[in-house]
């Protein structure tokens, strides 16, 4: 039987995280075993106390503390280093800002004989769309956030297939030609970790999932987007996009990712782009810091405090 360890990472969002964990606890678990590891990633609030009180009598949830903020990558690796020594066949990385369909994991699991990495169809939670005023009340809850990932390799930009589209069945086929899956919800065979290692802590957060997927593909593992597995994402519930943190890590990590996997022509274009941006007064301080930190090889948290 498939034996799954689910990892849910929290940082100062206890109510959001509890809603997510409780949603997972209600799923159809026929055909597999599931244990949830709720990892508090150095929260400065009372998250840890709340979790321990809430789940103290629930043997299906184990609360774990990192005692410092290790980032998305380090927080997940913190528990994965331990769990890989146990008998779990698969590991589910899932955000603390999602609500899940009762059958989502069962529908992922049924595809594990063929694929080693799997992500579901992910909708925006109603009201959390990028452009909420575009949609009718009936359409909200059916607006796609992720239906697979694709890369513009010439410019090193990743995008979500179907994002902002109302689901009308246009992405209802399994897609195993995606460039990447999302760490928002990613089911991974233990064989992948055993072969390629864990998430790369150089990234700290952002693009670590794309890097992991590229390493998996280069080692002949198969991945797929699974449309009949469905969850809802409370967009920016766990980290705000567009701010300094987002600008810093995405800028630096895009260069890190591009210099690993893009063509020589694209790498040369990235160097030219970096020079232009450093000289551009309209580019933010944290974007420029991200560029500098890449070239000075300051990874993980880098200059971010």
Per-region residue spans from a language model:
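A conserved acidic beta->alpha catalytic loop
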Residues: 23, 40-49, 68, 98
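Acidic donor-binding/catalytic loop of UDP-sugar-dependent glycosyltransferases
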Residues: 46, 97-111, 119
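Glycine-rich, basic loop-to-helix element that forms the pyrophosphate-binding segment
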Residues: 65-85
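Short, acidic, metal-binding catalytic loop of nucleotide-sugar glycosyltransferases
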Residues: 22-33
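Short beta-strand-to-loop acidic/aromatic patch adjacent to the donor-nucleotide binding site
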Residues: 87-99
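Acidic/His-rich active-site region of diverse nucleotide-sugar glycosyltransferases
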Residues: 74, 107-196
